[in-house]
Structures are given as structure tokens and as C-alpha cells.
UniProtKB/Swiss-Prot annotation:
Family, as annotated: Belongs to the UreF family.
Transmembrane segments: none
Location in the cell: Cytoplasm
Species the sequence originates in: Haemophilus influenzae (strain PittGG)
Keywords carried by this UniProt record: Chaperone, Cytoplasm, Nickel insertion
Function recorded in the entry: Required for maturation of urease via the functional incorporation of the urease nickel metallocenter.
InterPro entries, A to Z: UreF, UreF_sf
Leader sequence residues: none
Name of the protein described by the UniProt record: Urease accessory protein UreF
Subunit and interaction comment: UreD, UreF and UreG form a complex that acts as a GTP-hydrolysis-dependent molecular chaperone, activating the urease apoprotein by helping to assemble the nickel containing metallocenter of UreC. The UreE protein probably delivers the nickel.
Residue pairs linked by disulfide bridges in the UniProt entry: none
Any Gene Ontology CC annotation: cytoplasm
Length: 235
């Protein structure tokens, strides 16, 4: 019993560390198009911010970052390094907005730099070498999956943590940009509990025919963000 409990708590600690908002990777610098939506008054209230997060979660992330994370986790389980590289290349092709694309691999490289110091795994070492040699970019969802699997976390927990972390980031940025009260942000996060579980279920075994399915409005706003006159975020 004690051994099982200790393992469970160790896994929980690893998961909490992986989604710690204070990790020095720069995630708070990126809105991925949300800032444009706010400036255009498309997202301007608690209701519209919640609708935006729900749309991102169930119409964007499950076919893009979440799906690639799911497939990368499987590739780690199989020890398939070539597959991990292939997923990195594919994800690069689907990220059409330059700022979002660059932001993702910058976050991934920084995340790997932190956790490779704690997790000994041949594929993490090989992937870091491939990044240094410019053979892969090191996108955040791929690295997140690799680190989580190396920690011994389950795929379901990893997906939930990834979506939760992404949702919290959007809500935090939205509360700041619109602006809204902190309690409004907490209400939105509470309302997302069921949707987060649904997202995990929908992307646990992703249909590769749907990889890269786009929310065009978000991609356009992410590209428009590059030329905003004033902005708080890098993407």
C-alpha cells in the first residue's frame, strides 16, 4: 500500500512540475492570436472568452497540438525515434502563422532543456541532439509528450494536463487583455472541466486524417498579430 501510494504521489509531483506556470520557458509571452481577437472586439466579455476557449479546445487543439502530443506519446512508448522526427516535421507544416510556429518550438526547446537534467532517457538525448543539428525544431507538444512518458506518466493524465495548461494560459491572457475579473476567469476554468475530459477522449487515439484541421479564424488572427500597432504578447 505504501509503495503504491508513494508511486502515485511521485507521479503527481512530476505532473505538477511539468505544468508549473512558473517554469522559465516563456509561455506567458504568447497569446497565439487571442490578442488580435480582443483588439477587434470579437472576444470582449466573459461569455465570448469562454466560447473562444471551448472552440480552441474542441475544434482546434484536439486535431493539432493535442493530437500530435498523443501520437508522440505512443512513439515514445514504442521507442520510435524516426516517428518522433516525422511528427515534428508534420507539426511544423500545420503551424501556418509564423509567430505561433516559432513560439511553439521555443517553448519546446526550453522545456526539454529543463527536464533533460532530471530524466535520463535515450530518446530525450537523441531528440536534443537532433534539435542542435537542425534536423527537428522541437515543438512544445512533442517535447511535452516525450518528457511525460519518460517520467512514467499515463497518456490520459498527460493529455489532460496539457489541455488544462493550455486553457489556463488562454484564460489568464484573456482576463488581462479584455480585462475581466479574476473570478470570471475561475468561473470559466470551472466550466471547462467536462470539456477537458471530452478533449482527452477525442484525442486519445487520434484519426490521422484529421491532423492539422484548422480553425481558420484563429490562424488568420495569429498572422494579423504580426502587424498589430500595439501589443503585449509575442504571438
Amino acid at each position: 500500500m505504501a509503495q503504491t501510494l508513494n508511486r502515485s504521489l511521485t507521479d503527481l509531483g512530476a505532473l505538477l512540475h511539468l505544468v508549473d506556470p512558473t517554469l522559465p520557458i516563456g509561455g506567458f509571452n504568447h497569446s497565439n492570436g487571442l490578442e488580435t481577437f480582443v483588439q477587434q472586439r470579437v472576444v470582449e466579455s466573459k461569455a465570448t472568452l469562454e466560447e473562444y476557449v471551448q472552440t480552441q479546445l474542441l475544434q482546434n487543439w484536439i486535431y493539432n497540438d493535442g493530437a500530435y502530443l498523443s501520437l508522440a506519446f505512443d512513439a515514445m512508448n514504442e521507442g520510435n525515434f524516426d516517428r518522433l522526427c516525422e511528427l515534428d516535421w508534420q507539426l511544423s507544416a500545420t503551424k501556418v502563422a509564423r509567430e505561433s510556429r516559432e513560439g511553439s518550438f521555443k517553448l519546446g526547446v526550453r522545456l526539454l532543456k529543463i527536464f533533460i537534467r532530471y530524466e535520463t532517457h535515450a530518446l530525450l538525448t537523441a531528440y536534443q541532439k537532433a534539435i542542435a543539428e537542425k534536423r527537428v525544431q522541437g515543438y512544445f507538444p512533442i517535447v511535452f509528450a516525450m518528457v511525460a512518458q519518460a517520467m512514467g506518466l499515463t497518456k490520459a493524465d498527460t493529455l489532460y494536463a496539457f489541455y488544462y495548461n493550455a486553457a489556463v494560459g488562454v484564460i489568464t491572457n484573456g482576463v488581462k487583455l479584455i480585462p475581466l475579473s479574476q473570478m470570471d476567469g475561475q468561473d470559466i476554468l470551472f466550466d471547462l472541466r467536462g470539456s477537458l475530459v471530452q478533449a482527452v477522449e477525442l484525442s486519445f487515439d487520434p484519426d490521422e486524417e484529421w491532423l492539422g484541421a484548422a480553425t481558420l479564424a484563429n490562424d488568420i488572427r495569429a498572422m494579423q498579430h504580426e502587424v498589430l500597432y500595439t501589443r503585449l504578447y509575442m504571438s
